[in-house]
C-alpha cells in the first residue's frame, strides 16, 4: 500500500521501495548517477519504474525483436506505433495488433480479460481505424480442477462481456488446455480495424504551445503499477494484487471510440496526435508522444479528471484506469475538440502543453513534482543482452520417434475427439457475438474467421495460432511452425497472407535456458515470416510467465491477417456435398513427438520434434491458393492437432456428411502431426482440372457420402463410426468437463 505522504528522495533510496515498483538496484543506480545525476523523488522514481518495465521498454526482448522481419511493400506502419498498418489496395488499409493480459487474468480473470479486450480496441482506433473484428488466443491448465474451471468461465465471460457490449464481433481465436498453463493462464487479445489511408494517425505531440488534452473516463486508483506487475514473475503472493488489475466499462469505451473517430475524420486539420493510455497510464502515453516528436511536455496534474479524492502525483501518473486517451491539438482549437466529447458525455480537459527542449515536467498543487528528460523515460531504458543456454531438457531428449500401437483405431478416435484441446469450443465462443456489424462471412469454428470489407468485393481472413508443445521440443522449428500454421489457416480460407502480429509469452529471461527459448523461437518466426512475405508489424512481449519458478511452454502467439481479393474465393473447412472427391495435400509421415496422440496415450510429450521444411510448406500453400482462386476447391481444412483423421471428422460435422475413404497408411499415421497438409474436397466436375494442377502433391482418399458414416480403411484397421455419434462426442466433451 502506498503511503499518502510522499516519500523523500532519501526515503526512496534508503527503503529501497523502488524494488517493489519493479526497478532493480542497478537500474536505480543508473537513474541517480547517470540519467538524473541526483536522487529522484517518489513521483520520478515511479515514472521510471513504469516506463522501464519490460512491458513498456522491452529491455530484455529488444535485441530479440530486432531479428524479426518487418519489411514489405505492403507495410504502411510497422512496429513502434499503437498498431501496425498494411495496404490492402484501393486507398484502404488494415490495422491490427495483439496484446497479452496474462497476469491480470490470473488474479482477476473477468476484469483481466475484459480490459485486455478494451485496451487492444483503443490501440486500433487510436490509429484512425474502425475496429471490425476481435480474436482471442487462450491457454489454460487441464479443465479438471475447480480453479481452472473458474478461470475459464470468467475469462470467457470477460471477453464476451466487453466485446459484445461495444459491438465488435469476435470471429476467431484458439483455445488450448495443458498442465503447463495451470497456474499461469494466457489471455491474448487481437483486434483488426479498417481505415482509409488518408485517416492514418500517429501518437505524437509536436508544435510548441499546442494543447495536450485528456479525454474519456476519470482516473482512479485501479491498475497502479500494472505495467510492473505484468512484467514480474508470478507466484502465489501475487494473487492478492487485485488492485493492479484495471476495471473496464465497455459502454464508456463505445462512446470514447465514436468520439475519437469523429475527431479523426472531421477535425483532422487540428488533430496532431492521439494515443491510448495503456500500460503505465498517463506517463506512458504522454512521454511517448513527446519523445517521438522530439518535444518537451508540461502537465498540470490538478486538471486531470479524478474519480477518487486525494490522489498523489504517483497515483495519477501510473493509474491504468481504462477508457482514457490523450490528444495533441493545435493551440486555439481546444473548444472545437471539447464540443465533440461533450456531445458524447465524456470529459475533455486540457492538462498541459508541448514545450521547447526535451524535459518532461509535472506540476501538482503549484509545485514542480517531476522534471526529467523525456527521452530517458520513453527510449533510454537499459537494454540487456541476456545469457543464452541450451536447455537441459533438449540435451536429454530421446532421439527416437514415439511410435504408438493402436489396438482399436475407432476407439482411439472417439477418445481423441473428446480431448479438451481437440473438442469443439462452441460452448465457449458461442457466448461471443460473432455477427454484430453484419459483416462476418465465416464465423468461429473454421480455419480462420472471415469478414467482408463493405462496398468492395474483398474480405479479410484472420487467425491466431501456436502450439507450445512443439516449441518446448524445438524452439526454432516450433517458431517456424507457428507462422506456417497461421498461414495455412489463411490460405485454407482463400486468403493471401499479409502480415502478422504476435504475443511473445515466455518465462523469466534472466534464466539462460528461458532466454534460449525466446531467442531461438524468434529466429524461427523471422525466417518463416520472410519466406511467406508476412512481416511482423506489431506485437507484445509478455515475459516472466512463471508460477513459483515453473515456466509455461514457450508460446509465441501468431495473429495473422490475409486478404481475399474476391469474395467468391472464400473457402470453409466443411464438406459441402455428397459425392465430392476427398484429397490430402502433402505427405504423411510417422510424426508423433509432441502430438496430441502422444500426450493422450502417455500423459506427456517428449523426444525430438519431427522434421519440418518451410519450402515444402510454402509450395503446398501456393498450390492450394491457386486451386481455390481457379474455383477448383469445395472445401479446405488444414491438418494440425489430432492429425488427418481428426481433420476429416471435423470436415464431416458441420453438414453431417459421411465419407468412404481408403489409404495404404497404417491407422496410427492418421493421428500423426506432419506439417504442410490440407484435407480438400472437390466436386466431380472439377476433379480432372484439380488433379492436373496438384499432382503429384495430392493423394486421392475417396468420396463424401450422404450416409451417417465416417469410414476410412487403412493398411491395418478401419475407422468406422457414425458421424452423428462422433459429432456428439466432440461437441459434448468440453461442456461435460466444465460442469
Swiss-Prot record:
Mg(2+) 2 binds at residues 123, 276. The active site is at residues 55, 101. The keyword Metal-binding applies. NCBIfam families: FGAM_synth_II, PRK01213.1. Monomer. Part of the FGAM synthase complex composed of 1 PurL, 1 PurQ and 2 PurS subunits. Belongs to the FGAMS family. This is Phosphoribosylformylglycinamidine synthase subunit PurL. The gene is purL.
Amino acid at each position: 500500500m502506498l503511503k499518502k505522504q510522499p516519500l523523500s528522495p532519501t526515503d526512496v533510496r534508503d527503503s529501497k521501495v523502488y524494488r517493489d515498483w519493479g526497478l532493480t538496484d542497478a537500474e536505480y543506480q543508473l537513474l541517480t548517477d547517470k540519467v538524473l545525476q541526483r536522487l529522484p523523488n517518489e513521483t520520478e522514481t515511479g515514472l521510471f519504474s513504469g516506463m522501464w518495465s519490460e512491458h513498456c521498454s522491452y529491455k530484455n526482448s529488444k535485441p530479440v525483436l530486432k531479428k524479426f522481419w518487418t519489411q514489405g511493400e505492403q507495410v504502411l506502419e510497422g512496429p513502434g506505433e499503437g498498431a501496425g498498418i498494411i495496404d490492402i489496395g484501393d486507398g484502404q488499409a488494415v490495422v491490427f495488433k495483439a496484446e497479452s493480459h496474462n497476469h491480470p487474468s490470473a488474479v482477476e480473470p473477468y476484469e483481466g480479460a475484459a480490459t485486455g479486450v478494451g485496451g487492444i480496441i483503443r490501440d486500433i482506433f487510436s490509429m484512425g481505424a474502425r475496429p471490425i473484428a476481435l480474436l482471442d488466443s487462450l491457454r489454460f491448465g487441464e479443465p479438471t480442477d475447480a480453479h481452472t474451471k473458474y478461470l475459464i468461465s470468467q475469462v470467457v465471460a470477460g471477453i464476451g462481456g466487453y466485446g459484445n457490449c461495444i459491438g465488435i464481433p469476435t470471429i476467431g481465436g484458439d483455445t488450448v488446455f495443458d498442465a503447463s498453463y495451470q497456474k499461469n493462464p494466457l489471455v491474448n487479445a487481437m483486434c483488426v480495424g479498417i481505415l482509409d489511408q488518408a485517416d492514418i494517425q500517429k501518437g505524437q505531440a509536436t508544435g510548441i504551445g499546442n494543447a495536450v488534452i485528456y479525454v474519456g473516463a476519470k482516473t482512479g486508483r485501479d491498475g497502479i503499477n500494472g505495467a510492473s506487475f505484468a512484467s514480474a514473475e508470478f507466484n502465489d503472493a501475487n494473487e492478492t494484487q487485485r488492485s493492479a488489475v484495471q476495471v473496464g466499462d465497455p459502454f464508456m469505451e463505445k462512446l470514447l471510440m465514436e468520439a475519437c473517430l469523429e475527431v479523426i475524420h472531421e477535425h483532422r486539420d487540428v488533430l496532431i496526435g492521439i494515443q491510448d493510455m495503456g500500460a503505465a497510464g498517463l506517463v506512458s502515453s504522454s512521454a511517448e508522444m513527446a519523445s517521438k516528436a522530439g518535444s518537451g511536455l508540461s502537465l498540470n496534474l490538478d486538471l486531470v479528471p479524478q474519480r477518487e479524492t486525494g490522489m498523489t502525483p504517483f497515483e495519477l501518473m501510473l493509474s491504468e484506469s481504462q477508457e482514457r486517451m490523450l490528444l495533441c491539438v493545435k493551440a486555439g482549437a481546444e473548444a472545437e475538440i471539447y464540443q465533440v466529447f461533450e456531445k458524447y458525455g465524456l470529459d475533455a480537459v486540457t492538462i498541459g502543453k508541448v514545450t521547447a527542449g526535451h524535459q518532461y515536467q509535472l506540476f501538482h498543487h503549484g509545485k514542480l513534482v517531476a522534471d526529467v528528460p523525456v527521452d530517458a523515460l520513453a527510449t533510454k531504458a537499459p537494454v540487456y543482452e541476456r545469457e543464452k543456454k541450451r536447455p537441459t531438457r533438449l540435451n536429454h531428449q530421446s532421439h527416437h520417434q514415439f511410435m504408438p500401437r493402436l489396438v482399436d483405431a475407432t476407439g482411439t478416435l472417439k477418445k481423441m475427439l473428446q480431448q479438451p484441446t481437440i473438442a469443439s469450443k462452441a460452448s465457449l465462443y458461442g457466448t461471443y457475438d460473432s455477427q454484430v456489424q453484419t459483416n462476418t462471412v465465416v464465423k468461429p469454428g473454421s480455419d480462420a474467421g472471415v469478414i467482408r470489407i463493405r462496398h468492395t468485393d474483398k474480405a479479410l481472413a484472420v487467425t491466431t495460432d501456436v502450439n507450445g508443445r512443439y516449441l518446448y521440443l524445438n524452439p526454432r522449428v516450433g517458431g517456424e511452425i507457428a507462422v506456417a500454421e497461421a498461414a495455412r489457416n489463411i490460405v485454407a480460407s482463400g486468403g493471401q497472407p499479409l502480415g502478422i502480429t504476435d504475443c511473445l509469452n515466455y518465462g523469466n529471461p534472466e534464466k539462460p535456458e528461458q532466454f534460449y527459448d525466446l531467442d531461438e523461437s524468434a529466429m524461427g518466426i523471422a525466417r518463416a515470416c520472410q519466406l511467406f512475405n508476412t512481416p511482423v508489424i506489431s506485437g507484445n512481449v509478455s515475459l516472466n510467465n512463471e508460477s513459483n519458478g515453473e515456466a509455461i511452454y514457450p508460446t509465441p502467439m501468431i495473429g495473422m491477417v490475409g486478404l481475399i481479393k474476391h469474395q467468391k474465393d472464400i473457402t470453409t473447412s466443411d464438406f459441402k456435398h455428397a459425392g465430392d472427391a476427398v484429397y490430402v495435400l502433402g505427405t504423411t509421415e510417422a510424426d508423433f513427438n509432441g502430438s496430441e496422440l502422444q500426450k493422450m496415450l502417455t500423459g506427456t510429450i517428449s523426444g525430438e520434434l519431427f522434421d519440418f521444411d518451410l519450402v515444402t510448406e510454402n509450395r503446398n500453400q501456393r498450390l492450394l491458393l491457386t486451386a481455390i482462386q481457379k474455383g477448383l476447391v469445395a472445401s479446405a481444412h488444414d491438418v494440425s492437432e489430432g492429425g488427418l483423421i481428426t481433420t476429416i471428422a471435423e470436415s464431416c460435422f458441420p453438414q453431417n456428411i459421411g465419407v468412404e475413404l481408403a489409404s495404404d497408411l497404417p491407422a496410427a499415421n492418421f493421428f500423426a502431426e506432419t506439417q504442410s497438409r490440407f484435407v480438400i474436397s472437390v466436386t466431380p466436375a472439377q476433379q480432372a482440372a484439380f488433379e492436373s494442377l496438384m499432382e503429384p502433391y495430392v493423394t486421392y482418399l475417396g468420396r463424401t457420402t450422404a450416409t451417417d458414416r465416417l469410414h476410412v480403411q487403412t493398411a491395418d484397421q478401419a475407422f468406422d463410426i457414425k458421424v452423428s455419434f462422433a459429432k456428439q462426442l466432440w461437441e459434448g466433451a468440453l461442456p461435460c468437463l466444465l460442469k
